[in-house]
């Protein structure tokens, strides 16, 4: 019975890891054992930060909406409550986009919300 040699599989696996480690500093880019550790850690960071990015953007959108709403005399919380009362179903990403790039449309939205809030008070 012929003996099984696994050199090609090992070589392919090493090559895959070293390809992912391209651009790393020092031996992390060309020494397999070190590269494997760095690549695994990098993939952990990537996994974690894909989730953190969603949180970060939501926070950014809220900050932008709050700033734009306060320019018109409303707080973020009151503005969002007013939107719910009016029945406007826009997400924070779109509202932040409006607040930054479409100020006149956002002002109309604020006006609508303000009138509804005054009506309910």
Swiss-Prot record:
Example of a GO cellular component annotation carried by this entry: ribonucleoprotein complex
One GO MF term attached to the UniProt entry: structural constituent of ribosome
Keywords from the UniProt entry: Ribonucleoprotein, Ribosomal protein, RNA-binding, rRNA-binding
Biological process terms in GO annotation: ribosomal large subunit assembly; translation
InterPro entries in UniProt: Ribosomal_bL20, RIBOSOMAL_L20_CS, Ribosomal_protein_bL20_C
Classification via HAMAP family: Ribosomal_bL20 (MF_00382)
Similarity comment text for this entry: Belongs to the bacterial ribosomal protein bL20 family.
Entry-linked NCBIfam families: rplT_bact (TIGR01032)
Function: Binds directly to 23S ribosomal RNA and is necessary for the in vitro assembly process of the 50S ribosomal subunit. It is not involved in the protein synthesizing functions of that subunit.
The protein, known as: Large ribosomal subunit protein bL20
Source species taxonomy: Bacteria, Pseudomonadati, Pseudomonadota, Alphaproteobacteria, Rickettsiales
């Amino acid at each position: 019975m012929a003996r099984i040699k696994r050199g090609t599989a090992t070589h392919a696996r090493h090559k895959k890891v070293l390809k992912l480690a391209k651009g790393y500093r020092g031996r992390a880019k060309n020494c397999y054992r070190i590269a494997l550790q760095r690549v695994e850690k990098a993939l952990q960071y990537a996994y974690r930060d894909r989730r953190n990015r969603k949180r970060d953007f939501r926070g950014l959108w809220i900050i932008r909406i709050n700033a734009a709403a306060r320019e018109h005399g409303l707080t973020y919380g009151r503005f969002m409550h007013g939107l719910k009362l009016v029945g406007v179903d826009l997400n924070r990403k779109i509202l932040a986009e409006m607040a930054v790039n479409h100020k006149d449309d956002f002002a109309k939205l604020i006006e609508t919300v303000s009138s509804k809030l005054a009506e309910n008070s």
